[in-house]
Amino acid sequence: MAERSRVAVLISGRGSNMAALIYAARADDCVYEVALVSGDKPDAHGLEVARAEGITVEPMDARALGPDFWPRLQHALESAGIDLIALAGFMRIIPDNFLGKWEGRIVNIHPSLLPRHKGLKTHEACLAAGDKVTGATVHLVSPDLDSGEILGQLEVAVLPNDTPGTLAERVLIAEHQIYPHVVSQYLGRTRDFDWITGRVGEIALALAETSFQTSHGSPGWKVGSKSSSKFFAIMWNRHHGEETVGLLVKCSGQDEMAQLIEAEPELYFRPAYYGPSDWIGIKLDRPRVDWDHVAEWLQRSWLAMAPPRLTKLMRVSNEF
């Protein structure tokens, strides 16, 4: 099985959504594991539940720590090799500098169909508005409260005799269903060939005089004029016994290829048929892909294959 993404769950109370994420992760085909549970209250009941389920727990007291809380939390997350943070009843506003370090990697569950009824007392607001349907929303966390990109929603009917309490009970059931599903879906995209290809394409096509073209059925990118263009990047989709989604780029030769593969076999591979021509493979269907590193390889491969008129301009521009 491919390496699972590592999720940290942050809580402030009982952690029922945390528990849903933990139990869903026990399925054989789940793409994530809950690697850490923490929060802002050391006596939160959810910490006891997580500890009993064998999850690493990092109790923290935000009031006692004051301004040191966020740096300490950052250290705990980095030490645990966390890929994604899932907020589950975490009742603390996250500062912008912390959000910046985790952009696109913090998700939250909210008990309404956003953008309706942001903030607290959502069920009271729903009933006061006369809504016939409400639900749960999973979204990315952004600086603006409950305004990040919506990743998934699940509707819940509002009954004529509902109270905020009865409605909250049913919405919570919906939360427990949708949160693990959307987290798996969101993290699973990093193993999806089309998503990875799209990400590579954005970087490749930002380089000068590049174009998309297939190579023996595989997506690729060329540099140069139409009549004399050359491939500088080709996608690899689990071909010839190498069960990985990867990117083929040009390296300096067989010696460098052998050294890189020996030093980091989890990152590099020698692609069948392409390897003898100095194409090296970079594995991309794994957690924690360094896309800046991918961009560096694409630029390097572009320089190796681009015509002199383009490489000269690139080198001159890099001097300024």
List the predicted regions and their residue ranges.
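Helix-adjacent hinge/juxtasegments
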Residues: 58-109, 114, 229, 250
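N-terminal Rossmann-like dinucleotide-binding module
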Residues: 1-45, 49
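Donor/substrate-binding cores of folate-linked one-carbon enzymes
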Residues: 24, 32, 84, 88-191
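Structural motif corresponding to alpha-helix initiation and N-cap regions
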Residues: 44, 66-71, 120, 254
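Short active-site oxyanion
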Residues: 6-8, 33-36, 82-85, 243-247
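Charge-dense, helix-prone N-terminal extensions
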Residues: 191-320
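Conserved nucleotide-sugar phosphate-binding/catalytic loop shared by glycosyltransferases and other
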Residues: 45-64
